[in-house]
């Protein structure tokens, strides 16, 4: 289990890209079983992953979370997306996931990345739930006898990105590495 804080997300995922570049170089990428990303997570109501491969495991962990606190709805969402620190991992086929489904508190949305952003916009209970429910996910993954999600091959990664309509945005960003 490794906890990492990345810098430079807003400047182009600088920290996570650097991490993945080094992990490819030293082959440690092969040891990464899951990259759980927590960006704009508040009072999550369920878990998410890039693919459905670990849906049953995530729902089992979520069921335990829900039995402790019924505000956790134990929803599951799968899909590939861009523009957060999971992206460099996903582009290398590493399973990614996290939690979500909550909403930003205190009308914080308009202040995201704006001058009006302020610590008073943070909701303490939502932050506590973020930590609790995500700690349950991390513990559940670490304690699982098996994790169905495996690192995707290069072709499987390409297919996932095509299915998710991410080729064009990745081409625009200069990050589509496959030859057609």
Describe every region a protein language model picked out.
Residues 1-2, 107-180:
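His/Asp/Glu-rich mid-to-C-terminal helical/loop segments that flank catalytic regions of hydrolases
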Residues 6-109, 175-178:
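Metal-dependent peptidase/peptidase-like ectodomains
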């Amino acid at each position: 289990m490794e906890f990492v804080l990345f810098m430079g997300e807003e400047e182009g995922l600088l920290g996570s890209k650097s991490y993945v570049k080094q992990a490819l170089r030293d082959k440690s990428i092969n040891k990464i079983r899951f990259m759980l990303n927590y960006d704009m997570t508040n009072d999550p109501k369920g878990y998410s992953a890039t693919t459905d491969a670990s849906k049953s495991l995530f729902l089992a962990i979520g069921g335990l979370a829900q039995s402790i606190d019924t505000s956790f709805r134990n929803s599951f969402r799968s899909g590939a997306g861009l523009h957060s620190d999971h992206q460099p991992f996903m582009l290398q086929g590493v399973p990614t996931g996290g939690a979500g489904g909550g909403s930003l508190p205190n009308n914080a949305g308009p202040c995201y990345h704006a001058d009006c952003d302020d610590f008073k916009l943070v909701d303490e209970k939502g932050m506590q739930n973020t930590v609790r429910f995500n700690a349950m996910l991390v513990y559940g993954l670490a304690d699982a006898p098996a994790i169905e999600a495996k690192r995707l091959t290069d072709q499987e990664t390409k297919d996932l990105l095509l299915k998710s309509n991410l080729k064009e945005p990745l081409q625009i960003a200069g990050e589509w590495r496959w030859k057609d």
